[in-house]
């Protein structure tokens, strides 16, 4: 999705002030307060709100606050709205990673693997803040088969002109979306694209 670049000056100033307040509350662990402030910031975005870059990061910040309060259903809603608004050409590895983490905590293995794998393809192992998430993914997918360099972000998003993703990522179409869940033991039968 194409996003509008600059907010009107008065709204930009309000957004910056609210963002600073929200980040301060967030950094101090006052997540509920941060959510309220982010909601205020969201409410001043001109319609359609989804067209502004600020919408994506506000929704991600709201999702992160929910995640850290173990409110996974709410976090899923916020992160998925950020993910959808960003679109496949502007994918943020952190948003994709958090979606994978949330699905994992909601015991949705298929979507957890899907989004953790997307995050891995976008950013490699560096995106994994929690070693347990990387181990979880490695136990389900042979990650070495998905990159020529052992997972340094090679694959979807690393080189948009390379449609074969290093000849490894047969699960993902040209926009990085899954063609379906493939259990780890079944990868060989699909071959390289």
Indicate where each model-derived feature is located.
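Flexible helix-coil transition and linker loops at the boundaries of alpha-helical arrays
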Residues: 3-8, 45-52, 84-89, 126
């Amino acid at each position: 999705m194409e996003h509008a670049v600059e907010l009107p000056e008065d709204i930009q100033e309000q957004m910056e002030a609210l963002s600073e307040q929200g980040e301060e509350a967030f950094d101090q662990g006052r997540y509920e307060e941060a959510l309220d402030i982010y909601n205020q910031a969201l409410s001043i975005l001109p319609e359609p709100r989804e067209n502004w870059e600020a919408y994506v990061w506000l929704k991600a910040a709201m999702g992160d606050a929910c995640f850290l309060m173990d409110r996974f259903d709410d976090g899923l809603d916020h992160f998925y709205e950020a993910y959808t608004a960003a679109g496949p050409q502007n994918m943020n590895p952190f948003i994709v990673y958090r979606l994978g983490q949330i699905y994992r905590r909601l015991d949705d293995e298929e979507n957890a693997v899907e989004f953790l794998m997307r995050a891995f393809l976008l950013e490699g192992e560096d995106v994994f803040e929690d070693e347990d998430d990387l181990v979880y993914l490695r136990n389900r997918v042979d990650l070495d088969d998905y990159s020529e360099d052992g997972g340094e972000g090679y694959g979807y998003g690393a080189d948009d002109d390379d449609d074969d993703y290093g000849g490894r990522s047969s699960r993902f179409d040209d926009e990085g979306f899954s063609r379906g869940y493939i259990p780890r033991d079944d990868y060989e039968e699909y071959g390289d694209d």
